Design a protein with these regions (language model features):
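CBM-like, beta-strand-rich accessory domains located in the C-terminal region of large
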Residues: 1-163
């Protein structure tokens, strides 16, 4: 066990996590927040996800902000939002802020971001007992001075071929 080797969890988790799931006009909406970056960086993180009724489009927004009552951080902070892909996925960058994700079953999804720079980078997949496997991740980078909203969307290129 990794925890036993390092004497605890390798990364300290947040103290407060709040989530709410709702149905809004037939769309599943999840809103979640945590304070995992508060002590070290002075930021709270919130994510809002909206899934279409057909399951062919996922809209998201990640919000980084200081606690209420604080207008600005002492300095601008760089951030990186990571989306790790399964090792069987292939990914190619298209125009700026957009990439194409190809699944092993032939499905194709388009990922688009506003408010951050998109890059495709190497990653490791640790989920199964076979050990780590190389994979890819989408990384959204930018700088925040106090409050930043990064909006992104993932949708099926051909919704009628969803399995």
């Amino acid at each position: 066990q990794l925890e036993a080797m390092v004497g605890g969890l390798p990364i300290r988790g947040p103290d407060a996590v709040v989530s709410e799931l709702a149905d809004e006009a037939g769309q599943a909406v999840l809103h979640a927040t945590h304070d995992g970056y508060l002590k070290r960086f002075g930021l709270l993180h919130a994510r809002r996800l909206r899934l279409s009724p057909a399951g062919d489009k996922l809209d998201g927004v990640d919000i980084l902000e200081p606690p209420k009552g604080k207008l600005r951080l002492k300095q601008d902070l760089p951030y990186a939002i990571h989306f790790h892909l399964h090792p069987d996925c292939r990914c190619t960058e298209r125009e700026r802020g957009t990439c194409k994700i190809m699944l092993s079953d032939g499905q194709v999804w388009i990922f688009n971001v506003e408010g951050a720079a998109l890059s495709i980078e190497e990653s490791l997949f640790f989920v199964d007992s076979a050990g780590p496997r190389p994979g890819l991740q989408l990384v959204l980078r930018g700088t925040t001075f106090g409050e930043t909203a990064v909006r992104w969307t993932m949708h099926a290129e051909n919704p009628h071929v969803l399995v």
